[in-house]
Amino acid sequence: MKASETLIVIGREFGSGGRALGRELSKRLSVPFYDKELLHQAAKQFGISLPEFERNDERKPSVLRSMVESAFGMCPANSSNVNSDTLYALQSCVIEKLARQGGAVFVGRTADYVLRNNPRLLSIFVHCDEEGRARRIVKRGDCKTQEEALDMARRNDRLRQSYYNFYTGRQWGNAANYHLCIDLGKLGLQTAVDIVLHATFDLAQRIK
C-alpha cells in the first residue's frame, strides 16, 4: 500500500492544534482534507440544508438513536424534520464513501469509529495543555482573553465528548481507542507531523 492511501483520522481537544496538524499532513501526503467539508458533502449528497447539519455538528442528540443503521439506505431529501441520529448516519455514509476513493485526512466526526474496520486507518488523538490551547484560541480570534478561551475550550470538549461517547460507546480521549496520542503543545507542529508521517509510511509498508 502507498502511504498516500492511508486514512488518517484526528480526534482533538478544542484548541489543541489538531486541525492544523491535519492540514499539514494533507499537504505533505497530497491527499484530501475533510473537516467541516464533510458537512457540506453530506448536505449536498442527501439534499438536506447545511444549517441543519451545522446545528448538530459534534453535538449529542436529545433522543436515543433508532435509525442509525437503517438510515444508511435512506435519502430523506429536503426533509425539514430530520433528527440528529439520521444526520449522523448520513455523515457516516459520506465518510465511508470518501474512504473508498483513496487516502485522506479526516478531523473529528467519529471518523475513527466509522472506519474502525478499515486496515488503512491510522487514528490519532491530539491534546495540549490548557495554557497552550487558550493562546491558540485567542490568536485565531475566537476569544479576546485567556479566561474566555479556556471556558470555550472546556465547553466544546464536553460537547465533543458527549457526542463521541454516545455514538461510539467508547471513551473520547482514552488512549486505548487510538493508535497514536500526541501532545502538540510539548512536541510542536513539525515534530508531530514527522511522527505521524513516520507511522503512516510504516503502516503502508506492512499492508500489502
Q: Predicted regions span which residues?
A:
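ATP-dependent NMP and nucleoside kinases share a basic, alpha-helical "lid"
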Residues: 92-141
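C-terminal helical "lid" subdomain and adjoining coupling/linker elements of P-loop NTPases
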Residues: 204-208
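Short, amphipathic alpha-helical "lid/cap" segments that border enzyme active or binding sites
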Residues: 92, 189-197
